[in-house]
Curated annotation (Swiss-Prot):
Location(s) in or outside the cell: Cytoplasm, Cytosol; Cell membrane; Golgi apparatus membrane; Endoplasmic reticulum membrane
Ranges annotated as Phorbol-ester/DAG-type zinc finger: 541-591
Residues that bear Phosphothreonine: T184
Binding-site residues, Ca(2+): D483, D485, D487, Y489, E494
Domain of life from the UniProt record: Eukaryota
Region (PT region): 717-795
BP GO annotations: activation of GTPase activity; B cell proliferation; cell differentiation; inflammatory response to antigenic stimulus; mast cell degranulation; natural killer cell activation; positive regulation of natural killer cell activation; positive regulation of natural killer cell differentiation
Protein name as it appears in the record: RAS guanyl-releasing protein 1
Native source species: Mus musculus (Mouse)
Stretches that traverse the bilayer: none
Subunit record text: Homodimer. Forms a signaling complex with DGKZ and HRAS. Interacts with F-actin. Interacts with SKAP1.
Length: 795
C-alpha cells in the first residue's frame, strides 16, 4: 500500500490483496528505516493510470465508462486521449458484464444516435467497435454469443445503408491462422552456439538440463492468454482452460519426475548422485530466473518420499544440504512468499514467475474488492488493479529466453515428464528402497517446506495426434543419434541407457533380431509407456468373470485373501488376474491377452524371457508348475497368473536389474507344504536372480546362472514371473548333513509362527464353511428322500 494507497480516498483500498502491496509493506518493516518504502513498478504504473482517468478513477456508472471509451476517438478514427481506459474496459469488462451484453449496450447507443440523427456519434461507435475487433479479435473467435450479437449489429448497420460503417465493423479480417500461429510459433532462442546434446540422463550436464526444462516451461507459460487469466478469475478453477491445465500439469510432472529419477537408482550412493545433480539443476534454474520450474524441482526433492531416505541423505555432502536449505528458504510460503517476492522483484529481463503464487494473488484481489461501490458505480480501481496484475504476467511472454534448445532433447523430456503415478505408488517405491525401521514409530507424511500442490491432480486433456507426433519425433531423434550404420536397429544396451530418462514402466519387447531393437518396436514402446496414451484407454481392459475358487487365492490388487465358499472373487478370462469385487474397478494393470501353450519347455522359457524377469530364489517362491499352466504374451513376456504364486513387484531396470516387492506376498508357501522351509534358504549364498536349468538337459548345464545387469532404472508396477516344471525335485535336494544352515533369529521364528497362525485361522474358517455346506446338502438330501417316501405312500 505505502503512501500511494493512503493518498487516495476510496471506500476500499485498490491495492488490497495485490502482489505489490504485501511486498512493499514487508520491505518497510524489515528495513527499520524512517524513510518510506520505495513503491514498486506496478504501483507507479497503477498510480499514473488513475491520474490519467481523472474523476472516473473514483468510480463511474457503466454507461459513463462506455461513453468515455467512445469519445476517445476523433472524427477520423484516431485516439484523441489516452487509450488506457479502452484497454482496461475491453479486457476486464467480463468481471461485471459479459461481452455480448456490452456489445448490446453499444448497439443500443447506435440505435439512439440514428434516431437523433447524429452521424458523428454513429461513426465514433463504429470506430470503437473496430478497435475492439482489431485489438481483441480473439474474443470474437472464442465467444459464440458475442459473435451472434455482432451479426445482429452488422445487420442493423446494413439495414440503414451505411456502407462506411459496415466496412468498419467487418469481422472477416479475423484470420484464424494468425491466432493458431501465435500459440504454436517457435520460441526465438539464442542461436549463437550450436552443440550436440547427449540424450542420456547420466551424461546431461545440469546446465543443459535446466535450459531445456526452462524452454519447455516458457513454451507452456507463453500460451496462457489474457482471457485464460480472466476465465480463472471468474471460474476460480482451471476447468475448461486447457492452456493453464497444461502449464500446471507440466509443473506437477517435473516434481514427480525428480522424485522417480532419484528413487529409480538401486543404491543409496547412486540415489545421492542423482539428488546432487538436481541440486545443481536448481542452481542453474535460479540463475535463469525460472522460479516456476525451480519450485517444482525443489518441491520434488523436499517431498517426504525423498526426505525419508536416511541412507541416501547420509551420502549427500554438507554443502549440498546447505544449498537445499537456501533454496527452500527462498521458496518458503512464510509471510506470503515474502522471500520469493523480493527476489522476483529484483529480477530484470527474462524471468518465469511461480504461476500458483500469482494466481492466488489474483483470486485474493478479486474476492477482496467489490465489483460495485455503495452508490452503484463500477469499482474502476478493482478493474485497474486486476488489469495491471494480469498485464504484468502477459508482458513476460514477449521476452525471449537466453538459451539454445536441442529439439531431440526437447522431445525426450516431453515424453519423460508425462507421468501418471499416484502418491501411493511413489511411497511404495520409497519404502521398497529403504524400508521403515520397525523399532521406530510409523511416520505420517508431513507437509514439506516447499509445496507444489496448489493445483495437484491437474492433467492435460489427451490428444492422440499430439502423442503420435512427439513419439515419432523422439524415435527419429534416437535413430539419428544412435543408429550410426543406418540399418534400422539400435542395440539393447543403447536403448536401456536412453530409457533411463523415462521413469515409467519398462516393457519387454520381442526383438526382430536378437540383441537389437527396430524402429517399430521402439515406437510401440514409447506409445505404450506414454501416460496420456494410458489415460486414453487404448490399452486392453480386463474381462472379469465371477469365479468360484477351489483353493486359497489372493487378490492381485490388494494382496488380500478371497473369502467365501462360492464366488469368492473375479478372474480375468484373458490374463488370469484375480481380485475382490471391490477391487475390480481399481486395478491399474493393463490386461495382456495370453496365448495358451499346452507345454512349454525350459529351453523356450530361457530363450524368450529376459533373465531379469525370472523369479528370485526365496522361501515362498518354490518352483512348481501351476495347474492352469502359464502363457506367453505376444511381446515375449511370460507371466504366471495362477493362484499358486501371487506377488506384487516393482521392476527397476537400469544400473542393476532389481525386483523389489512393494506389496504383501501370499502367505501360503506351497500347495502341498506350508511349514517346511526350502532346502536352499538360509545358505550363505546371496539370493538373487537365477535361471534354473531342467534336469532333462545335459548334466553339464549350469544349475545357476546370474542374470546380467541392466543399466536402465525404470520404476513401475509390473508383475513378471517365470517358472520351471521339475520332473524329479528329489534329485536336487541334497542330504541334510551337506547343508550348512544358519540359526534363525527370534524375529524370523516369531514371524513364521504368526504366518502359520494366520494360515491356520484361514483354513479353520474355510473348514467351517465347508461343514455348513455339507450339512445343508445332507439336510436337502434327507428332505428329498422324505418327500419321495410321502409321494409313494400317497400313491
Amino acid at each position: 500500500m505505502g503512501t500511494l494507497g493512503k493518498a487516495r480516498e476510496a471506500p476500499r483500498k485498490p491495492c488490497h490483496g495485490s502482489r505489490a502491496g504485501p511486498k512493499a509493506r514487508l520491505e518497510a518493516k524489515s528495513t527499520n528505516s524512517p524513510l518510506p518504502a520505495q513503491p514498486s513498478l506496478a504501483q507507479i504504473t497503477q498510480f499514473r493510470m488513475m491520474v490519467s482517468l481523472g474523476h472516473l478513477a473514483k468510480g463511474a456508472s457503466l454507461d459513463d465508462l462506455i461513453d468515455s471509451c467512445i469519445q476517445s476517438f476523433d472524427a477520423d478514427g484516431n485516439l484523441c486521449r489516452n487509450n488506457q481506459l479502452l484497454q482496461v474496459m475491453l479486457t476486464m469488462h467480463r468481471i461485471i458484464i459479459s461481452s455480448a451484453e456490452l456489445l448490446q449496450k453499444v448497439m443500443n447507443l447506435y440505435k439512439d444516435a440514428l434516431e437523433k440523427n447524429s452521424p458523428g456519434v454513429c461513426l465514433k461507435i463504429c470506430y470503437f467497435v473496430r478497435y475492439w475487433i482489431t485489438e481483441f479479435w480473439i474474443m470474437f473467435k472464442m465467444d459464440a454469443s458475442l459473435t451472434s450479437t455482432m451479426e445482429e449489429f452488422q445487420d442493423l448497420v446494413k439495414a440503414n445503408g451505411e456502407e462506411t460503417h459496415c466496412h468498419l465493423i467487418d469481422t472477416t479480417q479475423i484470420n484464424s491462422r494468425d491466432w493458431s500461429r501465435k500459440l504454436t510459433q517457435r520460441i526465438k532462442s539464442n542461436t549463437s552456439k550450436k552443440r550436440k546434446v547427449s540424450l542420456l540422463f547420466d551424461h546431461l550436464e545440469p546446465e543443459e538440463l535446466s535450459e531445456h526444462l526452462t524452454y519447455l516451461e516458457f513454451k507452456s507459460f507463453r500460451r496462457i492468454s489474457f482471457s485464460d487469466y480472466q476465465n480463472y478469475l471468474v471460474n476460480s478453477c482451471v476447468k475448461e482452460n486447457p492452456t493453464m491445465e497444461r502449464s500446471i500439469a507440466l509443473c506437477n510432472g517435473i516434481s514427480q519426475w525428480v522424485q522417480l529419477m532419484v528413487l529409480s537408482r538401486p543404491t543409496p550412493q547412486l540415489r545421492a548422485e542423482v539428488f546432487i545433480k538436481f541440486i545443481h539443476v536448481a542452481q542453474k534454474l535460479h540463475q535463469l530466473q525460472n522460479f516456476n520450474t525451480l519450485m517444482a524441482v525443489i518441491g520434488g526433492l523436499c517431498h517426504s518420499s525423498i526426505s525419508r531416505l536416511k541412507e541416501t541423505s547420509s551420502h549427500v555432502p554438507h554443502e549440498i544440504n546447505k544449498v537445499l536449505g537456501e533454496m527452500t528458504e527462498l521458496l518458503s510460503s512464510c509471510r506470503n512468499y515474502d522471500n520469493y517476492r523480493r527476489a522476483y522483484g529484483e529480477c530484470t529481463h527474462f524471468k518465469i514467475p511461480i504461476l500458483g503464487v500469482h494466481l492466488k494473488d489474483l483470486i485474493s484481489l478479486y474476492e477482496a474488492m467489490p465489483d460495485y461501490l455503495e452508490d452503484g458505480k463500477v469499482n474502476v480501481q478493482k478493474l485497474l488493479a486486476l488489469y495491471n496484475h494480469i498485464n504484468e504476467l502477459v508482458q513476460l511472454q514477449e521476452m525471449a529466453p537466453p538459451l539454445d534448445a536441442n529439439k531431440d532433447l526437447v522431445h525426450l523430456l516431453t515424453l519423460s515428464l508425462d507421468l501418471y503415478y499416484t502418491e501411493d505408488e511413489i511411497y511404495e517405491l520409497s519404502y521398497a528402497r529403504e524400508p521403515r525401521n520397525h523399532r521406530a514409530p510409523p511416520l505420517t507424511p508431513s507437509k514439506p517446506p516447499v509445496v507444489v500442490d496448489w493445483a495437484s491432480g491437474v492433467s492435460p486433456k489427451p490428444d492422440p495426434k499430439t502423442i503420435s507426433k512427439h513419439v515419432q519425433r523422439m524415435v527419429d531423434s534416437v535413430f539419428k543419434n544412435y543408429d550410426l550404420d543406418q540399418d534400422g536397429y539400435i542395440s539393447q544396451e543403447e536403448f536401456e541407457k536412453i530409457a533411463a530418462s523415462f521413469p515409467f514402466s519398462f516393457c519387454v519387447m520381442d526383438k526382430d533380431r536378437e540383441g537389437l531393437i527396430s524402429r517399430d518396436e521402439i515406437t510401440a514402446y514409447f506409445m505404450r509407456a506414454s501416460s496420456i496414451y494410458s489415460k486414453l484407454g487404448l490399452g486392453f481392459p480386463h474381462n472379469f468373470q465371477e469365479t468360484t475358487y477351489l483353493k486359497p487365492t489372493f487378490c492381485d490388487n490388494c494382496a488380500g485373501f478371497l473369502w467365501g465358499v462360492i464366488k469368492q472373487g473375479y478372474r480375468c478370462k484373458d490374463c488370469g488376474m484375480n481380485c475382490h469385487k471391490q477391487c475390480k474397478d481399481l486395478v491399474v494393470f493393463e490386461c495382456k491377452k495370453r496365448i495358451k501353450s499346452p507345454a512349454i519347455s525350459t529351453e523356450n522359457i530361457s530363450s524368450v524371457v529376459p533373465m531379469s524377469t525370472l523369479c528370485p530364489l526365496g522361501t515362498k517362491d518354490l518352483l512348481h508348475a501351476p495347474e492352469e499352466g502359464s502363457f506367453i504374451f505376444q511381446n515375449g513376456e511370460i507371466v504366471d497368473h495362477s493362484e499358486e504364486s501371487k506377488d506384487r513387484t516393482i521392476m527397476l531396470l537400469g544400473v542393476s536389474s532389481q525386483k523389489i516387492s512393494v506389496r504383501l506376498k501370499r502367505t501360503v508357501a506351497h500347495k502341498s507344504t506350508q511349514t517346511e522351509s526350502f532346502p536352499w534358504v538360509g545358505g550363505e549364498t546371496t539370493p538373487g536372480h537365477f535361471v534354473l536349468s531342467s534336469p532333462r538337459k545335459s548334466a553339464q548345464g549350469a544349475l545357476y546362472v546370474h542374470s546380467p545387469a541392466s543399466p536402465c532404472p525404470s520404476p513401475a508396477l509390473v508383475r513378471k514371473r517365470a517358472f520351471v516344471k521339475w520332473e524329479n525335485k528329489e534329485s536336487l535336494i541334497k542330504p541334510k548333513p551337506e547343508l550348512h544352515l544358519r540359526l534363525r533369529t527370534y524375529q524370523e521364528l516369531e514371524q513364521e509362527i504368526n504366518t502359520l497362525k494366520a494360515d491356520n485361522d484361514a483354513l479353520k474358517i474355510q473348514l467351517k464353511y465347508a461343514q455348513k455346506k455339507i450339512e445343508s446338502l445332507q439336510l436337502g438330501k434327507s428332505n428329498h428322500v422324505l418327500a419321495q417316501m410321502d409321494h409313494g405312500d400317497s400313491a
